[in-house]
Structure formats: structure tokens, C-alpha cells
């Protein structure tokens, strides 16, 4: 009886988790909005509503803003016009809360998650070939005592350095060619670099 109840609970959890995932169409629109919002942090500078500005914070912020309703109030607060935007997504209330309920480990969820936990508990490993990356995927590096994420934008990466000054907001954009020829080889995304762990994709995306 107890085993049957446990199996039922596990099945229900899987059904709930699956129902909250984005389907293929939603995932494509999520990527388009995610990339656009991330680009705006580069073009305009980090939004004043983006707290905890670092590499993982960029992913959390862009994901959370992507899942919101992009009405005129939202557009105004983000300095965007209604032109040249992706189509709006139709999402359930549960799906809109996905970026407010990151798996933090130890059975906890919440709006904050570290870079390592974003990868370990909220993403799936895709591979170490950059050609496998889709826009919005994450490129993950582990230096042992520190981890770093870059966001693949399609032809280049963007990231936040984790620090900012009055003259430097911390945002960076680097072409793939620049990235693959960096003098600091710790940040080159190929399988000969032991610090490059791989390309990761958010768990709730269908592809």
C-alpha cells in the first residue's frame, strides 16, 4: 500500500512538472524574448530592477522578465517600443512563475539560485560542441572556487562580469571568434579546456 502511494505521488509530481514545461512553440518564443531582454541589458545597461548583477543574475533576470506579460506598462518600464518584438507567449499561471521557483537544492525553491545550482538543478547538459547551442543556452565554466556563465546569443555570447563601477556596468559581448582565440585559455569553450564544463539548457524548455 505504501509503495503504491509513493508511486502515485511520484507520478503526480512528474505530471505537474511536465505540465509546467514549455512546449516547442512556447520554448521558441521564450528564446526570442530571453535573447531580446538580455540584449537590452547590453544596449541600455542593466535594468534598475535587475538585482544581484552577476552572470547567473543575468539568466535569472532575463528568464523572469521573459515569462511576464509584455504589456504597455512592461514595455515602458523596460525602455522598449512595441516594434520588432517577438510574438507574445500564452502561458499558464504556473509557467509564468517558473523563474520565481528555481530549484535551490535540498528540497528548496525560490527566486534566487547560484550559478552552480542553476546548472546542477535547473538545466540539462547538451554537450561541449558550441554548434549544439541554441540562443539562450548557457556556456558554463568551473574554475574550482568560482563558476561562470555566458549566454549564447546565436553568433556571440554576452555575460556580466560580476562587478560594476561608475564607468563600467559589467556587461560584455564577445564574438565566437574572439572567444575561441582568447589569450586567457580558461574561458575558451572547447573540450581541451578542463575549465569548460559544457553547454546547458534550462530544464523547462522543450528543446
Curated annotation (Swiss-Prot):
Keywords: Signal. InterPro entries: DUF1175. Residues 1-19 form the signal peptide. To P.aeruginosa PA4490 and T.maritima TM0986. This is Uncharacterized protein YfaT. It comes from Escherichia coli (strain K12). The gene is yfaT.
Amino acid at each position: 500500500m505504501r509503495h503504491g502511494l509513493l508511486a502515485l505521488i511520484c507520478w503526480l509530481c512528474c505530471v505537474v512538472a511536465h505540465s509546467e514545461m514549455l512546449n516547442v512553440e512556447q520554448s521558441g518564443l521564450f528564446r526570442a524574448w530571453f535573447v531580446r531582454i538580455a540584449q537590452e541589458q547590453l544596449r541600455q545597461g542593466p535594468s534598475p530592477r535587475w538585482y544581484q548583477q552577476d552572470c547567473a543574475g543575468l539568466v535569472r533576470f532575463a528568464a523572469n522578465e521573459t515569462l511576464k506579460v509584455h504589456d504597455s506598462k512592461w514595455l515602458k518600464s523596460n525602455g522598449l517600443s512595441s516594434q520588432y518584438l517577438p510574438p507574445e507567449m500564452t502561458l499558464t499561471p504556473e509557467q509564468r512563475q517558473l523563474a520565481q521557483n528555481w530549484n535551490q537544492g535540498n528540497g528548496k525553491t525560490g527566486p534566487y539560485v547560484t550559478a552552480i545550482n542553476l546548472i546542477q538543478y535547473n538545466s540539462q547538459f547538451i554537450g561541449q560542441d558550441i554548434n549544439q547551442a541554441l540562443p539562450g543556452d548557457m556556456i558554463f565554466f568551473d574554475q574550482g572556487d568560482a563558476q561562470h556563465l555566458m549566454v549564447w546569443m546565436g553568433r556571440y555570447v554576452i555575460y556580466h562580469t560580476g562587478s560594476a563601477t561608475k564607468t563600467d556596468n559589467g556587461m560584455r559581448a564577445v564574438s565566437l571568434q574572439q572567444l575561441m582565440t582568447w589569450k586567457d585559455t580558461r574561458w575558451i569553450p572547447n573540450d581541451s579546456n578542463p575549465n569548460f564544463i559544457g553547454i546547458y539548457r534550462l530544464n523547462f524548455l522543450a528543446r
